[in-house]
């Protein structure tokens, strides 16, 4: 007859008294290869409306209560609740939500338990709704089928010496977005949500906007960044500059002129120019061309403000380092060997080559993004 052992009255699963190195590295390997489970489970919880319920709740909720509160009730509530419970306990193991088990709290030893869930601090970034700071649009872009297909083409891209995205779709990413309205909207929403988060902190810590009369946002998307800056600095006349298919989706903004064009041809004149998440799309030669066009568009003592991640010289096992290298790999997916995040030294060299010989300052903004100011 089979026998079972338990620890402290609970059936122990996966506990190892003295894990050896092989045990640890094998579990690590399996966890790394199963990494897709986290973003896609978070996405499902957001789409179901469960994340919004957790954020709005004033107390922890069971999976049954959460399932019953869904806007689109499930036809098989018991099965749905069981699935939701498994999803949430998985997310709890990754620190995404908090979980408490009633039997443990009440000292019960009858083997029955009821889990209740609450939002963890990170959940605030998964909120939805107009005007809220959220990484949800970025997450939906990252988990889109377009992105997933691109990941499947990394190996072939390396072997063929091609950009993985181009290998998957037969055209560069911006050409694809220009021809695909749905994905273009998804991408623009992702960029706008990121701009909202970073620009809010930029306005809190960055000094100098009061000195500008005309500010140009190159690759400014729908104008979110410029709109937020003008809300505090009405002295500025803003120019939101981007490709025609992007500007076509931009709504009118008071004090901001939407201008369609190509930054490789020319850049509108201004006292200062912002480049947010632009240079990491391009190789060094293209970046110097963009910066030279910025130099031409600026007056003496004019400033270009570059908002980018900064790569550490040596990879580190820190959240900031991992995030920077995550995005560096993303640039490789969409732009091949050319697109990349850079070290501070590499950015400085590009600016100097483009002619910026004046003052240089770097200011930490938020979420591993830095503002690099180069003066003409």
Curated annotation (Swiss-Prot):
Residue sites binding S-adenosyl-L-methionine per the record: 219, 242, 263, 276
Active site (record annotation): 280
GO molecular function, one term: protein dimerization activity
Gene Ontology BP, a term: methylation
Reaction(s) the record says it catalyses: (E)-isoeugenol + S-adenosyl-L-methionine = (E)-isomethyleugenol + S-adenosyl-L-homocysteine + H(+)
Subunit structure: Homodimer.
Disulfide bonds: none
InterPro entries: COMT-like, O_MeTrfase_dom, Plant_O-MeTrfase_dimerisation, SAM-dependent_MTases_sf, WH-like_DNA-bd_sf, WH_DNA-bd_sf
Lineage: Eukaryota, Viridiplantae, Streptophyta, Embryophyta, Tracheophyta
Pfam families per UniProt: Dimerisation (PF08100), Methyltransf_2 (PF00891)
Protein name per the record: Eugenol O-methyltransferase
Family affiliation: Belongs to the class I-like SAM-binding methyltransferase superfamily. Cation-independent O-methyltransferase family. COMT subfamily.
Annotated EC: 2.1.1.146
Keyword Methyltransferase: yes
Keyword vocabulary terms for this entry: Methyltransferase, S-adenosyl-L-methionine, Transferase
Function: O-methyltransferase. Substrate preference is eugenol >> orcinol monomethyl ether > resorcinol monomethyl ether.
Organism: Sorghum bicolor
Tissue: Expressed predominantly in root hairs.
């Amino acid at each position: 007859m089979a026998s079972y052992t338990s620890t402290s009255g609970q059936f122990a699963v996966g506990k190892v008294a003295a894990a050896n190195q092989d045990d640890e590295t094998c579990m690590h390997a399996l966890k790394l290869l199963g990494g897709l489970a986290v973003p896609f489970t978070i996405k499902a919880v957001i789409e179901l409306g469960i994340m919004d319920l957790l954020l709005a709740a004033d107390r922890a909720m069971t999976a049954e209560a959460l399932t019953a509160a869904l806007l689109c009730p499930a036809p098989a509530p018991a099965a749905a609740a069981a699935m939701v419970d498994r999803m949430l306990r998985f997310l709890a193991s990754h620190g995404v939500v908090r979980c408490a088990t009633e039997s443990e709290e009440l000292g019960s030893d009858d083997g029955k338990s009821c889990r209740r869930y609450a939002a963890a601090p990170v959940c605030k970034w998964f909120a939805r709704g107009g005007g809220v700071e959220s990484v949800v649009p970025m997450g939906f872009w990252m988990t889109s089928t377009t992105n997933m297909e691109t990941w499947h083409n990394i190996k072939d891209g390396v072997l063929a010496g091609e950009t993985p995205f181009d290998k998957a779709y037969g055209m560069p990413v911006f050409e694809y977005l220009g021809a695909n309205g749905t994905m273009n909207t998804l991408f623009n929403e992702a960029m706008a949500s990121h701009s909202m988060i970073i620009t809010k902190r930029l306005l809190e810590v960055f000094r100098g906007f009061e000195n500008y009369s005309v500010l140009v946002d190159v690759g400014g998307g729908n104008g979110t960044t410029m709109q937020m800056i003008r809300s505090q600095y009405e002295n500025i006349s803003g120019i939101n500059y981007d490709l025609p298919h992007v500007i076509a989706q931009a709504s009118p903004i008071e004090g901001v002129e939407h201008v369609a064009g190509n930054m490789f041809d020319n850049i509108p004149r201004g006292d200062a120019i912002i480049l947010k998440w632009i240079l990491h799309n391009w190789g060094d030669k293209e970046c110097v061309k963009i910066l030279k066009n910025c130099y031409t568009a600026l007056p003496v003592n004019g400033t270009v403000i570059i908002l980018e991640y900064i790569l550490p010289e040596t990879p580190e096992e820190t959240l900031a380092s991992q995030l920077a290298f995550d995005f560096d790999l993303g640039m490789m997916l969409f732009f091949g060997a050319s697109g990349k995040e850079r070290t501070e030294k590499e950015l400085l060299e590009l600016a100097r080559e483009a002619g910026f010989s004046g003052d240089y300052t770097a200011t930490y903004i938020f979420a591993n993004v830095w503002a690099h100011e180069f003066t003409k």
